[in-house]
Amino acid sequence: MKHFDYLVNEQLKTMERLLYLQSELERCQDIEQELDSLDEGAELAALREEMALMKINLRKIQKTFENQTEEVIRSYQEVHLNTI
């Protein structure tokens, strides 16, 4: 059961990273709209680069979360089968 608890704890940490990055991306999208309306081309290009990197990181974290979910399920099933 300790392993299961550890996995769940790690998954919660990943979820926190995921939510943080999503909120940062949303914040950048708001700034993107402002810069676009102000016709700030150079700053807008730099922001879009940063957003592209954030999206890559977000996909990596989402994949990690999916893998952790599968591992948590396997661990739970192992614990459950051992108690039957």
Describe each PLM feature range.
Residues 23-52:
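Short E/K-rich amphipathic alpha-helical oligomerization segments
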Residues 1-34:
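N-terminal acidic leader/helix
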Residues 6, 10-13, 20, 39, ...:
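Non-transmembrane, amphipathic alpha-helical segments
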Residues 54-73:
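Amphipathic alpha-helical coiled-coil segments
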Residues 68-84:
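Long amphipathic alpha-helical coiled-coil segments
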Residues 33, 46, 63-64, 78-79:
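Short, charged/polar low-complexity linear motifs in solvent-exposed/disordered segments
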Residues 12, 61-64, 84:
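Low-complexity, flexible helical/coil segments
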